Structures are given as C-alpha cells and as structure tokens.
Amino acid sequence: MGLTGCNDEAFDIDSVNKQTLLIMYPWSGTENSAGLYSDMVNNLNQIENAIKKNKGLKSTRVFVFMSTSATESSLFELTYNSSTFTVEHQMLENYTGTAYTTTEGLTDIIGEVKQKAEALNYALIIGGHGTGWNNISDWTDYPNQAKRKAALKTRSFGGLDNTYAINVSSLAQAIETNGIKMQYILFDACYMSNVETAYELKDATNFLLASPNEIMAKGLPYEDIWSYLNTTTPNYASIISSYYSHYNSTSTPYASLAAIDCRQMDKLAAIMKELNSKYTITTERLAGVQTEDGYTPNLYYDLGNYVDSLKPNASIKDQFATQLKATVKAAQSTAEVYSNINATTITVKDFSGLTISDPSSHPVALRTKKQTKWWKATHEGE
C-alpha cells in the first residue's frame, strides 16, 4: 500500500521560497542633509553587482526599503533578469512621512514583505547610524547634533536628527508582532553589538551581526560577503573575516564585527545575575577596563574584560567564559578602532565582541540603563 499526501500532486520543495531578506535604509540625515544616503546607494550597488556576478538570487527573495529624503521612502523587490543580465527594481509601495521610525510603521513594512514573500527563513540588514541600546528619548543633546573636530566619516550616533531615529525595542516588537523570527539581523551601523541590544532582540532573531565600535561610512564590503549572506545557512565567520581583511588593508584600518547567538542570551544573563549579586567593580579597576567608544564618560565597556575586572572566583569565571564563547560565535577586531566623536583611535587590547553599559556613568546610562530588559534580568529586585 502506497502513502500519498492530501492531494495526488507531488510536493516540489524547490518551489518553496527558502529565504526572504529585507534590506532597510531609513533616512540618516536631516531635512537639509542627506546623511549617509550616498553610502547607502553605494551599498545597494555593491549588492546588485554581487547578484549579477552570481547570475541570480538562488533561493532568496530580496526586498529593499529605502528613504530618498526625510519624508519619502519606497519598498521594492530586487529581481534578476537572466536575458539582460541586470538587476531590476520591482516597485511595491511608496511612503510619505516618517512612520518607518515607529513600531506601527515598521510592523507594516515587515508585514508587507512577509505577505509578498512568505518564506522558511527571514533575515534583515539595516544600514545607517547607530548609538546602541539607548532610546531616542534618552538623549537630551542628541550626539550627531553636536559640533565635532574634523574627522573621518563613520556611521556613528543614531540619525543626524532624532526625528528619524528608530528604537531597538520598536524593531523587536515589529518583528515579533508579525509572528516571525529572523535568522539574522545585520546592523551596518555603529555600537550595536552590546548585551542590552542582543537581549532586547533575543525573541526577534537567532543571530545578531554587529560592531561594538564605530563603522566607517562606507559600511560593509557587500560584494565580498554577499554569498555568505544570501543563504539560509549564513557563514558568519567568513562575513567577519572578509570585513576585517577588507578594512585592515586600507588607509582606514579600523573594523570590528561579531556574530552573537541571541538564543544564548538568557543563559548569559543568568550568569551575569549571579556575578552582580556577588561582585562589584572598584573605580580603580574600572579605569583599566577596555573601552569601546569615544564618549565622555565612556558608555560601552568590553564585556569579557569587565567581568575579568570584577575578580570573580575561578568557578564562576570559568562558567562565564564558557557561556561567552557559546554566545559570541565569531568576532574579530583590528588593532585600533576609530571614534568620530573625538576624531581619535582607540587601542584594542581586549576584545570579546560584546560590550556592556552596566558600569557606565554616562548621563544616558545613568538615566535609563536600569529600564532595559537586560538590567532587569541581571539585577535582583531592581
């Protein structure tokens, strides 16, 4: 006796959309400044060149949300024309206003993509400025509005204007509301590889690819890494090593990137809760912890070096080291990283791939770090 499905037609597994990838380039400037727009266009051109080089998209459908001004955006699909060997834009939606910065707007955009291309796997790439875990409202003097010394251009500080900035919590909620979980979220933006962000996104993505430092304005080398991204089984180590190699051989040899397994964040938080219940860091020890930013006071500290500086006993120190290794799947940094904030470089002696703001006395940290999900999960009764 033979077995059949609910109908007599054979199920063609190759007909199933394996992966849907959304690339988001929200506005990174002001009403009068284009911010990183030209860099975003260049990144998209690199991706399209990689698609043409690979003669198609394999089993992935790629959608792009791009803001062309502060209040004008569009959503389109990238398709490969095998007759003309070109990448075409199939326009889906045009948007006016800044709803893309809100939970509701993000929910609609992600929902539209899901409706157009339901898939076995989803992934998200976000390009723009970044300040890390903190919210728009946390800043009384939004970083990019301050005058700075002449400096190399990076993707630092959130939007040039907080009107167009997006909270991590809004992104997480938008993804979860749509009933999906990303295979990975890649932030081509500064300061996004921190425990607070990774914990906030743990129910929205399996992996977080991000830098604990600033990223140069040109962003990631997409032609080099596209084949590692355009797959249901991304090669995170190769993405990171390609990024490192690309910048390490240039006149701006500043790059760091990490792949964080967000499914491990609950276990990491449990160990940190035990550490926090038993140990505190002295001012003298904190002064020696590896910093990852140019803020004054510092906002981001290397997680591994911070825990070492707590001087925990051997048992819990080993537990933490084992869990950190399970959480950070791959990470690499150049010998120095760059800070646009004060136009200087930071020597990297300790690099775990994740930062933490627990010990920070920066006004933004003091104002709201205790409100983060990470803090609440790692501190008893606070």
Where do the PLM segments sit?
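Terminal, contiguous helix-loop blocks that mediate binding/assembly
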Residues: 12-14, 140, 150-382
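Catalytic-core segments of thiol-dependent peptidases
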Residues: 67-70, 82-84, 98-177, 189-190, ...
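Loop/turn elements at helix/coil->beta-strand transitions in domains of secreted/extracellular proteins
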Residues: 18-20, 56-62, 117-123, 179-184, ...
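Bacterial Sec-dependent N-terminal signal peptides
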Residues: 1-23
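Structural motif
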Residues: 25-27, 189-190
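A domain-level signal for caspase-like cysteine endopeptidase catalytic cores
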Residues: 26-130
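Short hydrophobic segments within beta-strands
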Residues: 22-24, 127, 359
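Extracytoplasmic/secreted cell-surface and envelope-processing proteins
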Residues: 30-37, 72-74, 132-136, 192-197, ...
